Curated annotation (Swiss-Prot):
Gene3D superfamilies, per database record: 6.10.160.10, Ribosomal protein L20
Gene that specifies this protein: rplT
UniProt-recorded name of the protein: Large ribosomal subunit protein bL20
Coiled coil (residue ranges): none
Family: Belongs to the bacterial ribosomal protein bL20 family.
GO biological process entries: ribosomal large subunit assembly; translation
Provenance organism: Tolumonas auensis (strain DSM 9187 / NBRC 110442 / TA 4)
Length: 118
């Protein structure tokens, strides 16, 4: 069996990992063995957090809608229920944006939700 020399491929692999670890603190950006661990862990965090980001934004939108709805005398759950009964289909992202930037429109939506609940 012939001898396999890995100089080129090993250097390429090391270079790829060290480039991915650029900007990391200390040995994590300079030493291959440590950099491999750091890059792998970073990938795991990135994968996890891409999913968590969706949850966190939805959570933020709900908190904003709840705060604005309560200023108009309605809880979040009753507000959403009222919108459903009034057959107003606006997603939470847009509702949150309206609540933050356009108080008059949000108040009108709350009034429609209250009317649908009554």
């Amino acid at each position: 069996m012939p001898r396999v020399k890995r100089g080129v491929t090993a250097r390429a692999r090391h270079k790829k990992v060290l480039n991915a670890a650029k900007g990391y603190y200390g040995a994590r950006s300079r030493i291959y063995r440590v950099a491999v661990q750091a890059v792998t862990k970073a990938g795991q965090y990135a994968y996890r957090d891409r999913r968590q980001k969706k949850r966190q934004f939805r959570q933020l939108w709900i908190v904003r809608i709840n705060a604005a709805a309560r200023l108009n005398g309605l809880s979040y759950s009753r507000f959403i229920n009222g919108l459903k009964k009034a057959s107003i289909e606006i997603d939470r992202k847009i509702l949150s944006d309206i609540a933050v930037h356009d108080k008059a429109t949000f108040t009108a939506l709350v009034e429609k939700a209250k009317a649908a609940l009554a």
